[in-house]
Amino acid sequence: MPVKVRIALDAMGGDFGPSVIVPGAAISLGRHPDAEFLLFGDSALIEKELAAHPALKKVSRVIHTDVAVSMHDKPSQALRRGRKVSSMWLAIEAVKKGEADVAVSAGNTGALMAMARFCLRTLPGIDRPAIAATWPTVRGDSVVLDLGATIGGDAAHLKALAVMGAAMASVLFDLERPTVGLLNIGVEEIKGGEEIREAAELLRAMQSPRFEFVGFVEGDGIGKGAADVIVSEGFSGNIALKAAEGTARQISEYLKAAMSRTWRSKIGYLFARDAFKALKDKMDPNKSNGGVFLGLNGIVVKSHGGTSADGFAYAVDVGYDMVRYDLLTKINQTLNREAGALVSTPTAQEAVS
């Protein structure tokens, strides 16, 4: 376990670049004073932001590059133009070289997945990585994957995702045997497409001592905490994520409008202010920011591109925690024990956004 957690940042990633990445790193440093940073990107822009954060500057090293991956680049374009030279690639490569323990980027999801896969390579039997994140529920938190790294996938792919997600939940939630469910349009065994029904059969047949398969989970079951791990292919998983984030913001706006409508509602808000603050904090999408790319020979964390400094700080926190929990080693151990789940998945395709 490293004395310091070394975090490589794609400082040019996301919608706002260093103006969000640097302050976000400073916020996270305040929570994790044993972290140090490598910031890749335009040194002039980065140094300008660092000037306002002397504590961060003291534990940071800036590596200049003029090349940044845009949010509109296709994965193939990003690899052709940015391999070896872009801020995104260099942050990932720092993990490969052992100069950093984790890379964090708010950049283009498809490009990040392609570069991470090309640079770090995937674990034996894993065709493409999956994005996994913690999801707040009424029972605590769940691990949900895949949130958009791949589109589609056969039953073996879903089975491998279940094994990786269960390993992550075991580490994060200190669970000996987490429950695992497959996201589906119904809980009945006859529901869903052929791939998901076959995946359910494979997971039941495993009878794994390391997780308990509980069957299918409908969309509303995610928020109910129906399982410790919810597994989906990336297309459906990403839609579920964006729908939940949009709903949270919508409810927040409804409450804000309702509480300011009349003088009675304003007085009522004053009495219930602490309860409303707790609700707002629970529903804040920023606090769930930071998806981990599982299935790689290294740790890469994806932040939302349009996040704020506070939101990016949470993504950095996720990267820090993954290193401190020694997640990669523990997931590898679990995958080696469940070697039958590690099969190639030729039907899974790259996400492009």
Curated annotation (Swiss-Prot):
Keywords: Cytoplasm, Lipid biosynthesis, Lipid metabolism, Phospholipid biosynthesis, Phospholipid metabolism, Transferase
The keyword Phosphoprotein belongs to this UniProt entry's keyword annotation: no
GO cellular component, one term: cytoplasm
Function (record text): Catalyzes the reversible formation of acyl-phosphate (acyl-PO(4)) from acyl-[acyl-carrier-protein] (acyl-ACP). This enzyme utilizes acyl-ACP as fatty acyl donor, but not acyl-CoA.
Pathway(s) per entry: Lipid metabolism; phospholipid metabolism
RNA-binding found in the keyword field: no
Gene Ontology terms, MF aspect: phosphate:acyl-[acyl carrier protein] acyltransferase activity
Enzyme Commission code: 2.3.1.274
Catalytic activity: a fatty acyl-[ACP] + phosphate = an acyl phosphate + holo-[ACP]
Entry's Gene Ontology BP terms: fatty acid biosynthetic process; phospholipid biosynthetic process
Listed name of the protein: Phosphate acyltransferase
HAMAP family hit by this protein: PlsX
Gene3D superfamilies (alphabetical): Isopropylmalate Dehydrogenase
